Amino acid sequence: MGTKGTVLNGIQPSGTVEQPEHESGFNEMVHAYVAAKFYCYLTEWFGERGKKAFVHGTQLHAEQRGRRMAQRAIRNGEELNFETYNRYGEWISTDAVKRLGIANQTKVVSWGPDFENRVYVCPWQKQFEAMGMTEAGHVYCEHLDNSICRGFNPYLSYEVTQTLHRSDCCIHIVRNAGMKPDTDRSRRPEGLKSFEYHCANSFWAYSEVSTAIFQAKGEAVSAAVLADFERDYGKEMADAIMKYRDVNFNVVDE
């Protein structure tokens, strides 16, 4: 997965990225890399405004995912409740992170009335840490899942009270979720998307927000991220991201 090198500490355009271990192709760690790179450039070039833009981009691509989930559920006559939210998720752990032993490890500590889930191992956290970017990871994760849920159904109350980047686990709480220990939380396979798709969704959401806010300088941020991506993952994977330029991520495509 790109060239091995020194761990990044903030932005280092001419450097390399140290992965947890070598794996080729799109996966959770590549997805985290995209977010980390946008955080690097946005905060270095624009300071606090850049951080706010990063949060806005995170919320955009997360809400887009949630809306696609909701559209599939509505098509199938499902209620937009938290059980359906679980079943219509768009990803499952890749073989790459399973081989590395860093696939998500979670534990439900409360089923009701509030559903509480804790995450103890996460490949996104591992990637942010390997890049020396735990603050970027914390900002990303405190806004991601609650935004996916908001895109799915804004009337569900989803809270992220701590993240693995600063604590021993992430804590996710959904108020009055209506969940039970025997609730089916398995993913419906027809809604799963590849990590190539998810990485492209992330890249183009951040790119759209960066350009809208910072105009030509925002376009330069996207170009810098893409250049780093091609350096670390190769032209073929960078070209794969580019082919999604005109995709409407707000709607289901099948």
Predicted regions and their residues:
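N-terminal accessory segment detector
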Residues: 1-114, 123-143, 150, 156-169, ...
